[in-house]
Swiss-Prot record:
PANTHER family: AMINOBENZOATE/ANTHRANILATE SYNTHASE, ISOCHORISMATE SYNTHASE MENF. Binds 1 Mg(2+) ion per subunit. Feedback inhibited by tryptophan. GO terms for molecular function: anthranilate synthase activity; metal ion binding. Mg(2+) binds at E336, E473. This is Anthranilate synthase component 1. It catalyses: chorismate + L-glutamine = anthranilate + pyruvate + L-glutamate + H(+). The keyword Protein biosynthesis does not apply. Pfam families: Anth_synt_I_N, Chorismate_bind. Chorismate binds at G309, T310, Y424, R444, G458, A459, G460. Its cofactor is Mg(2+). It is an enzyme of class 4 (lyase). L-tryptophan binds at S52, P274, Y275, M276.
Length: 494
């Protein structure tokens, strides 16, 4: 087995760095990221798959399969716990992001130029309710799913699948402070075991049964009348001038009798998206196909991409072009998009160098598998003294899932919705050893816990919203995920 570094080379690098990637490279052109994930996943350990389909039409260059961890950090309300090398320490906090900062600041990584921008770090999610630590928003609603507010796993084994070449790199970080020889041996053994599993294990085929979702199988936390009532109340706040827009959501749940792995398998071909993820945290699983970035930080460049304005895809190229023109000439859609662009500029401006915030590719159309959207890029340069956690705090949660002005909209959401949002409308992604970050908005995302499956969807309420139409919008948004879940439940593994 060829490795990128010898023990002596690692020892030399450890004079300047305390996190050093050890890896081997293999040609596995008969495998897919999903088949690799299914071969490597183990019950009782952390298993994560991160993929991307650019524009929903072609797969991104790299997919990441992450297994195992000897460290995690998770919080629920003001109590947190850190698991490290077999020991659990509990802590109280009113500022959980500062605790994560402490962890990230310890890393001094060596970056091998042959590796992509992510090869390890913290991976997981931030629930929507984390914002209640940092903004004057109450936390009074019940939490029926009982998920953690923050759940981050430090990567152990990362398999980087290059979708262009068919090669993989099996990467394990060496933590110098734990002893160079011991860590080198540990990393080498993990790489060897991972390669062995890939060679020995088979995968199953899925006999897919196409069907439309049966809405009777699902139970919402609102009746239709109750949801229409909260839309009316939101419109009263809008009429009084409290907010311009507020995003209200409802949550659907059902008992799930199948294999949760198959939800991701079905979702992957039904609705490929820029951010696809499967976080398998044993009893808790987060399965998503999000079209929308929350924020990205890469080498000091901050980027977010407000998405607002939607049309269904046409059946032909000519119909697509007509629908694009119709979307770009819709004053209501343009106004909503402009509001979100302004919100993004303000958010990034809190942590960017003065004068560096700008809008690029303003109001272009991006096509996805089933819909097209108006998209703009808002970028800026990170101000001295700030890091990924500051950027997350400044931009969290997205305006597309809260409203504008953001703080007042969130206060109204807390008043009118009847349950904690949890993972919905939060973010899923990573903070790398180098301090880079890529976070998706947790929409079009299913949460599986103890054989129950939850799907949540929202609608942006504005002055001229029709309550029944807004209820229909939340149902229609949820249906794509419901369809994947019900197909997964009916399909047979072979």
């Amino acid at each position: 087995m060829n490795l990128n570094l010898s023990l002596e080379e690692v020892r030399k690098l450890s004079e300047n760095y305390n996190v050093i990637p050890l890896y081997t490279e293999l040609l596995v052109d008969t495998e897919t990221p999903l088949s690799i994930f299914l071969k490597l996943k183990e019950k009782g350990q952390f298993n994560i798959l991160l993929e991307s389909a650019e524009g929903g039409e072609k797969w991104g260059r790299y997919s990441f399969i992450i297994t195992g961890s000897s460290f995690y950090l998770r919080t629920r309300k003001d109590i947190g716990e850190i698991y490290e090398r077999g020991k659990v320490n509990f802590f109280e906090t009113k500022d959980p992001l500062s605790k994560i900062k402490e962890v990230v600041k310890k890393f001094i990584p060596y970056h091998d130029e042959r590796l992509p921008r992510f090869w390890g770090g913290l991976v997981g999610y931030f629930a929507y309710d984390v914002v209640k630590f940092y903004e004057p928003v109450e936390d009074k609603n019940p939490d029926p799913i009982h998920t953690y507010d923050i759940y981050l796993v430090l990567t152990d084994v990362v398999v980087i699948h290059d979708n262009l070449t068919g090669k993989i790199k099996v990467v394990v970080p060496i933590f110098a402070q734990n002893g160079i020889e011991e860590e080198y041996e540990r990393a080498k053994n993990l790489i060897r075991d991972t390669v062995k599993k890939l060679k020995e294990r088979g995968t199953t085929f899925l006999n897919v049964v196409e069907k439309e979702p049966d809405f009777k199988n699902w139970r919402s936390n609102f009746t239709k009348e109750e949801f229409e009532d909260i839309v009316k109340k939101a419109k009263e706040y809008i009429a009084q001038g409290d907010v311009i827009q507020v995003v209200l959501s409802q949550r659907f749940r059902k008992r799930f009798k199948g294999n949760p792995d198959n939800i991701y398998r079905v979702l992957r071909f039904l609705n490929p998206s820029p951010y696809m993820y499967y976080l398998d945290f044993d009893q808790l699983k987060v399965i998503g196909s999000s079209p929308e970035i929350l924020v990205r930080l890469e080498e000091g460049r901050i980027e977010t991409r407000p998405i607002a304005g939607t049309r269904k895809r046409g059946r032909t190229e000519e119909e697509d072009k007509r629908l694009e023109e119709d979307l770009l000439s819709d004053e209501k859609e343009r106004a909503e998009h402009l509001m979100l662009v302004d919100l993004a500029r303000n958010d990034i401006g809190r942590v960017a160098k003065t004068g560096s915030v700008r809008v690029e590719n303003f109001m272009r159309i991006e096509r996805y598998s089933h819909v097209m959207h108006i998209v703009s890029d808002v970028v800026g340069e990170l101000r001295e003294g700030y890091d990924a956690l500051d950027v997350l705090k400044a931009t969290f949660p997205a305006g597309t899932v809260s409203g504008a002005p953001k703080v007042r909209a969130m206060q109204i959401i807390e008043e009118l919705e009847n349950e904690r949002r949890g993972i919905y409308a939060g973010s899923v992604g990573y903070i790398s050893f180098q301090g880079n970050m890529d976070m998706a908005i947790a929409i079009r995302t299913a949460v599986y816990r103890d054989r129950d499956i939850f799907v949540q969807a929202g609608a942006g309420i504005v002055a001229d919203s029709v309550p029944e139409k807004e209820w229909e919008e939340t149902v229609n948004k949820a249906k794509a995920l419901m369809k994947a879940i019900e197909i997964a439940e009916e399909s047979q593994e072979e």
